[in-house]
Amino acid sequence: MALSRREQRRSGASTFTKVREACAHDCVLLFFAEDRADWIHIGPIANRLEELGNHVLRLTSDPADTVIGDQGGLFTGGIVATTRLLVSLPPCIFVTTMTDLGTYHLKRSINDVKYVYVFHSLLSTHRAYRDHAFDSYDIFLCSGPHHVAELKKAREVFGLNSRELLETGYCRLDYLIKQEEQFVQSDRTSPSVLLAPTWGPSSLIEYDLELIVQELLGASIEVVLRFHPMSTRHQPELGAQLMTKYGSDPNFSLDQSFSSIDSLMGADVIISEWSGVAHEFAYGCLRPVVFVDTPKKAHNDTYSQLSLGCYEDDVRESLGALVAPRDIGSIPEVVTALVKESPDWKSKLSELRGRHVFNPGRMVPVAVEQIIDRMN
C-alpha cells in the first residue's frame, strides 16, 4: 500500500535521521532505488553484501516499494525530501542504477560519498541515454567491454573527472541464466513469441504493432504482448484496447507483470526493436531475437562526438534476424525458421554472451568483492 502524503513527509524526515546515525558509527552501504523495479538490478548485490555481515541500508523514493515492509527499506519522501537527503548524505558508499545524477534535482552530496553505478541495460551508454547521464559517478560496474570503452572515451572527449571502470557483468543475467538452467519447456505444436516493444518514437507502437499481432495470430503463433513500463505510464489505454480487439483469440495474452520472467522463459523468440530486454532474453535464455529495424533510439545529439559505434547496432543481426518495417508480413516465416534452428542458436548465443558480457552467471559475487575492496 502506498504511503499518504503526511506519511511520506514524516518518513522522509525519519530516513534522514536514520541514515545520519548509521553513517556516524559504521561503514554503511546505501542502496538507492528510484522505482521498485530497480531492485531487479541492485537487490541481489545488496542481499549478498548483507549476508556477509555488511551494514546495508535500502533507500527508495517509491512509496509503494515492497522493500519498505519486506526488507526494512527506508522511504526517502517526496521530491523535496529526497533532494535534501541526497545532497546532505554523510560519507558512505552509495549504490544505484539511477542515471542522470547531478543533471536534474538529485545532486551529489556535499560530503565525501562514493557513487557506484550498476547498469540496468546492456545498451551502449552514449546514444540511448541523455547528455551527461553518467558524468557524476565515481565507480562503474560495467556490464561488458563496450561500456568500458565508451565511458573511457567520454572521459577523454568531454574532460570528465577520473572514475573507476570495473569489469563486473550484468546482474539480471545471473538470475535469468539460473532460471533457464531449471526451466522445462512445455510441449506445444506452434511457436510462442514475446512481443516486447520499447517506448518512445522508435517503438513498434508507432510502427504497425497491430499488424505484427495480426500476422502472428494468423499463422497460429502464440503472442504474449509486454509493454515497456514507460509506455503503460504514458499510454495506459493501450493494453485494454488490444485486449478488446484480440483478447478472444486463445493465442493472444497481455503480460502486465514487469518483474515476472514467466513470459521470457516461455517464449521461443522475442520480437522487439531497441528494447534492452531483447538482449537479456538472447543471453539469458539463449534463444533468438527478431529485431524490427525502426529508427535508432537516440536520446541526445552528441553521441557521434565519441566516434564509436553502438553495441546494439553491432549485434542486431548476430542475435537473430533483422526485419525492415516494410517486411513485417514476413515475420511469421522468420519466427518459424528461427525456432527450427534453435539448437544452433543456443551455442552461438552462448559464445556471443561470453564475448560481450563480463562474468556471465557470476556478476553478483564479482560485484560484491569489488565493492568490499573499495570499502577498505
Predicted regions and their residues:
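Membrane-proximal basic amphipathic "stem/tether" segments
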Residues: 1-27, 33-35
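A nucleotide-sugar donor-handling region in carbohydrate enzymes
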Residues: 2-13, 133-205, 229-232, 346
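Conserved catalytic-core segment of nucleotide-activated headgroup transferases in glycan assembly
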Residues: 38-54, 171-243, 324-328, 339-343, ...
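Short acidic-hydrophobic, aromatic-tinged amphipathic segments that line or gate anion-handling sites
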Residues: 73-81, 252-256, 319-330
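Donor nucleotide-activated moiety binding/catalytic core segment of transferases
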Residues: 82-86, 237-279
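Structural alpha-helical scaffold elements that stabilize or flank donor/cofactor-binding regions
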Residues: 85-87, 133, 186, 215, ...
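Catalytic binding pocket for nucleotide-activated donors in carbohydrate/polymer assembly enzymes
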Residues: 134, 162, 276-355
